[in-house]
């Protein structure tokens, strides 16, 4: 980056973000900043506070970083950050977004660099925000054709197909079997032994990435958690989202145990839940964006049930039942 790179890295690792910004901005004029410095400034601002002012300033950094070095990897990183952050800008009222410019930048970079997974993920998020479902599907289809067979890509694709009517249930089932084939199994020696709970109370675990304000899953689940018989059941609630809010805190008070597993890798999450010896685990995510289907493929409870959150199969052998009514099936 420049002679200050070592100091930049040290301050960033020590989370001295304000000092880092001061050092970068003091060292040269804005127009003389390198692409790497623009990228670092943009990221650092957001780590200090992700408010409207910092989002707009970071967008300016990322855009300038891309324009400064379009044909370098750090320039490409700036563009990925620029597109991803633009998605967040949609949440802020009274902000203008130049859609045409963003799409032109994307196409320009794709023409030069060819296929790049993270660039495709960024534009996929952008198309989702525009409600351009067909374009989302086109991006995901290109990723799958480039051998991106990770569960996130595959589940995103099958989820997107639920928004149009060109797939039959047979098509969904066929693709869900493909997901099943591509979802990895951990070695048995890596996993905590799966044990049945010896207590009289049944241990029920609910896994969701949607226990947040105004999400429909919370309205369905709250009634259950308010009314279950505490003499017969012990409830575990596992969150799979980044930040808790008031709704999350309210739900914690309704259950015996709660834990956020969003930052746990798949193996650690599986072993954490297995160690609790729950009897029945409910998947409230399915193929939605917050999914953790690999946990259920590797089995976290003797009985596993797909319930609210995603109203279809994702073809996993690990899911024993779908809890539904005649209107859903």
Regions found by a protein language model. Give the residues of each.
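Alpha-helical solenoid repeat scaffolds of the TPR/TPR-like class and their adjacent stem/linker regions
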Residues: 1-329
């Amino acid at each position: 980056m420049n002679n200050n790179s070592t100091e930049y890295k040290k301050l960033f690792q020590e989370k001295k973000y304000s000092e880092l910004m001061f050092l970068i901005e003091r060292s040269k004029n804005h127009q003389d900043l390198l692409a790497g410095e623009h990228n670092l400034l943009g990221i650092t601002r957001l780590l200090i506070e992700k408010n409207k002012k910092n989002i707009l300033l970071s967008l300016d950094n990322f855009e300038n970083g891309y324009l400064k070095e379009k044909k370098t990897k750090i320039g490409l990183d700036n563009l990925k950050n620029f597109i991803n952050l633009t998605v967040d800008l949609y949440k802020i009222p009274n902000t203008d977004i130049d859609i045409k410019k963003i799409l032109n930048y994307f196409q320009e970079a794709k023409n030069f660099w060819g296929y790049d997974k993270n660039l495709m993920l960024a534009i996929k998020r952008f198309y989702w925000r525009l409600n351009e479902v067909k374009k989302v599907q086109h991006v995901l289809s290109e990723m799958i054709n480039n051998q991106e067979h990770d569960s996130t890509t595959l589940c995103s694709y099958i989820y997107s197909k639920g928004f149009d009517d060109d797939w039959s249930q047979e098509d969904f089932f066929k693709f869900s079997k493909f997901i099943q084939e591509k979802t990895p199994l951990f070695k048995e020696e890596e996993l905590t032994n799966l044990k049945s709970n010896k207590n009289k109370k049944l241990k029920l675990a609910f896994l969701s990435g949607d226990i947040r304000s105004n999400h429909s899953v919370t309205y369905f689940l709250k009634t259950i958690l308010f009314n279950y018989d505490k003499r017969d059941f012990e409830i575990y609630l596992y969150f799979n989202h980044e930040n808790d809010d008031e709704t999350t805190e309210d739900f914690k008070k309704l259950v015996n145990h709660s834990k956020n597993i969003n930052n746990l890798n798949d193996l650690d999450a599986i072993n954490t839940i297995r160690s609790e010896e729950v009897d029945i685990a409910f998947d409230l995510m399915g193929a939605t964006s917050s999914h953790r289907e690999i946990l259920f493929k590797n089995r976290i409870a003797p009985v596993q049930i797909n319930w609210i959150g995603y109203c279809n199969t994702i073809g996993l052998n690990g899911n024993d039942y779908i809890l539904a009514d005649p209107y859903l099936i």
